[in-house]
Regions:
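Right-handed parallel beta-helix
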Residues: 16-19, 53-63, 84-97, 113-123, ...
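Extended aliphatic helical segments
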Residues: 6, 12, 50, 79, ...
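Ordered hydrophobic segments in well-structured contexts
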Residues: 12, 41-43, 51, 76, ...
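Extracellular beta-strand/loop-rich repeat segments of large surface/secreted proteins
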Residues: 396, 400-424
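Hydrophobic aliphatic residue packing
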Residues: 44, 79, 107, 130, ...
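Extracellular beta-strand-rich solenoid/capping regions of secreted or surface-exposed proteins
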Residues: 2-12, 25-55, 62-86, 97-113, ...
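Glycine-centered small-residue motifs that form tight turns
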Residues: 39-40, 69-76, 101-107, 125-132, ...
Length: 424
């Protein structure tokens, strides 16, 4: 009926003697549902430390969204700076909509939050399940976030303002952002998102990034040396069916992205980059990319870069050239240029298999635009196809191609050089 405020101390809240539910009141007469200023069910302040669902039976935290209809509602938990919240696997959060001030999420955290539980059927304005601002958010273990919606960005999670987000061994699916980041949205300089492992699938966005958006100066890391996440069957209305990295608009657009290991498969983009679309850097930003040991396959886009799309001012993380190495880029499709990779800036490709990609126009394996430069070293380009079987089944060169003798381009693939273009 009213907000429970934890000002100090350590508390463990479990269900005993059977499953239990803590539910938001459905009466608009109660203070928690004051339509001028609806409250959170829990507020965790200062040095307080609260754990839900550490053991015992299932504890359900219910936000009563379906019962309250179109009423003004706030989220379930607000963790303020210095507060600590852990939700463990014997708890779950459901049926919560935060529409208060058009900026909130069911869980709002500025502190230290760890999630190892189910979150489902929730909705927010920035983050369908969780919004992390300046805090540390760890999502791990048995976490399952599903069927959540953000009216803006981050269908499941929104991370910003120097927020630190890590995801490991978790699953996020059937979430939707009406704008960007069907599952995850991370932005701002000094913010970071690290996805070590897990599954992110069947999410969608109205604009870019069907699964994961990172931009406006943020850092994104996918995978680790021994394993990586599976990002599959996501759909975006704009660029980046799977991942939109170094994204954004305006002077602060860009970021730093490192792909260490993982798979990005069967994603669909309504613009560029069926698997991955890397964004252009703004005048105050940078767009840096390093990729190794990735599988980018069976992705589709309506424009260019069926597998990967790279921008004009792309760089490496410490090198002049963005680096794509030791990876498989296979069976991707685009309607225009670059079935496997669309190169607009300086890109170094080494020891990659670029095979069985298709384009309806030019450069089934790789398309190099005017102003783009590709250094190609080792690896194989084979069995890629264009609609007319002429215009660069292997590589279409409208920019510069620098190729090492150790690289292999199969006889069934063609390097197409328009008049005035050459190979170094």
């Amino acid at each position: 009926k009213k907000t429970i405020t934890v000002r100090t101390g350590y508390f463990v809240i479990n269900a005993t003697n059977g499953d239990k539910t803590i539910k938001r009141s459905t009466s608009l007469k109660d203070s928690i549902n004051d339509q001028r200023n609806p409250g959170y069910c829990f507020r965790i302040l200062n040095t307080s430390y609260v754990i839900f669902g550490l053991g015992g039976n299932m504890l359900t935290l219910d936000g009563s969204w379906k019962d309250l209809g179109n009423a003004n509602m706030s989220g379930w938990i607000n963790v303020e700076p210095g507060g600590r919240l852990y939700i463990e696997r014997f708890a779950r959060l459901i049926n919560t909509f935060n529409n208060e001030k058009k900026s909130g999420a069911p869980i709002m955290t500025y502190g230290d939050t760890q999630i190892n539980c189910e979150i489902g059927r929730c909705k927010g304005y920035n983050g369908g399940a969780i919004k992390n601002i300046k805090g540390t958010l760890k999502v791990y273990g048995d976490t399952k976030i599903h069927d959540c919606v953000s009216v803006t960005e981050g269908g499941a999670i929104h991370n910003s303002q120097k927020g630190t987000l890590s995801i490991e061994d978790s699953e996020i699916w059937n979430c939707e952002a009406l704008e960007e980041g069907g599952a995850i949205f991370s932005k701002d300089a000094d913010s970071s998102c690290v996805i070590y492992s897990g599954k992110i699938h069947n999410n969608k966005s109205g604009e870019s990034a069907g699964a994961v958006f990172s931009g406006y100066g943020a850092t994104l890391v996918i995978g680790r040396s021994t394993s990586g996440p599976e990002i599959f069957e996501n759909t975006s209305g704009g660029s980046g069916g799977g991942v939109r990295c170094n994204g954004g608009t305006g002077s602060d657009a860009g970021g730093i992205t490192t792909f260490i290991r993982g798979t990005i498969t069967n994603n669909t983009s309504g613009k560029h980059g069926g698997g991955i679309a890397c964004g252009e850097a703004g005048e105050n930003g940078q767009s840096k990319l390093y990729m190794s040991y990735m599988t980018i396959s069976n992705n589709t886009c309506t424009e260019s870069g069926g597998g990967i799309w790279t921008p004009n001012n792309i760089q490496g993380t410490g090198t002049e050239y963005a680096i794509i190495q030791n990876s498989r880029i296979t069976s991707n499709t685009c309607h225009k240029y670059g079935g496997g990779i669309s190169v607009h800036g300086k890109v170094y490709v080494s020891n990659c298999s670029i095979e069985h990609n298709f384009t309806g126009d030019r450069g089934a394996g790789i398309h190099i635009t005017e102003g783009g430069t590709l250094k190609y070293d080792m690896g194989t380009i084979s069995d890629n196809k264009t609609l007319d079987s002429i215009t660069g089944t292997g590589i279409y060169v409208n920019g510069q191609l620098k190729i090492n003798e150790s690289a292999r381009i199969a006889e069934n693939n063609v390097v197409y050089l328009p008049k005035g273009k050459y190979i170094e």
